[in-house]
Amino acid sequence: MAKNTESIFKNPLLRWIDERFPLSSLIKDHATEYYASKNFNIWYLFGVLSMVVLVIMFLTGFFLTMNYKPSAEDAFNSVEYIMRSVENGWLIRYMHSTGASFFFIVIYLHMFRAMLYGSYKKPRELIWVLGMLLYFCLMAEAFFGYLLPWGNMSYWAGQVIVNLFGYIPFFGESLTEWIRGDYFISDITLNRFFAFHVIFLPLAILGLVAAHILALHHVGSNNPDGVEIKKYLDQAGKPIDGVAFHPFHTSKDLVGITVFLIIYFAAVFFAPEMGGYFLEVDNFEPADPLKTPEHIVPSWYFTPYYAILRAVPNAALGALFLVLAVLLFVFLPWLDKCEVKSIRYRGWQYKFALTLFAISFIALGYLGLQPATGIYVALARFFTITYFAFFLLMPFYTKLEKTKNVPERVVYKKKES
């Protein structure tokens, strides 16, 4: 029998629902009685912002689907119809396309925060793995959605990415044909990608988001000091250094969400193309199998991996390095041998390595947008080496680093050293 939890509602209808559905316990477990550290900083805002963008993407995607036609003959024209003839269609389309870029901005910052404060370490390894699975699904969702406008750049970029599967030994060619449903990117491919984009992957993303949050609330949130607040409790059994997520953290989050939405809508209204980074110029032309864009590049949020692909002379090895560049994130909890979580108390080795990694990732992102010639290839190879060195050398430099003493309780204001 379920535990008898006193209802928090006074409204008769809500109390009636609460007697038949665990609404009160859900709110208590995940909001009013879920305790998080008092010293959260701005880095802890990006997880909430990712949820905000996810809602925006689902709502705008729903309305776009009402008027979009997933066929090679009608796809491009249906997008133009949405932009020109559907009431506020231009706004919905720009909210969706801008939202895709903002989604990856907040996701990358959310991942970087975990790397700053050791949020992937015990007991949060599963949270990290679920988060990475969610990241993989988001990458797939973005890729499948990228082809749907049937612009010339999305057509040829899709051709390049799908062909990478052909380098898988033994069954690569068969897998590539299965993904396309044809011998080349065609109407069949577009229909398949549409099905993945609007049904399969959104369901997978929702499931992983729920699992990610449940796992987080089961073990508790990390904090900038990397200490466990459950260790010190008051007489009521509540963490001394924790506050209820609602209303304390939700109130602060609302301020951050407001600022974020101002920036987001400024981009939507004044720079939806963002100089060709959010919406490429070549995608304003319909797909043409006989006209290759001068410079084929994927969306900017994939360009770090694209630069790694092009940095390796052998195409098959380049594809392997691309896959490894993404997969290595999953193994961070086991590659990092240091007992200390937060960068505040870690040695100079990890601080230097993480800084070099961040520089490498940003540099590769820039290089992936440039032509694969001369100095750009040489720099891409250098930063590919530093990118992989962060992961592959981690078991060694994290063992050698000299750490500071970690406080028993959270620190509310960082003291100057």
Over which residues does each language-model region extend?
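Membrane-embedded and interfacial regions of multi-pass energy-transducing membrane proteins
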Residues: 2-102, 106-417
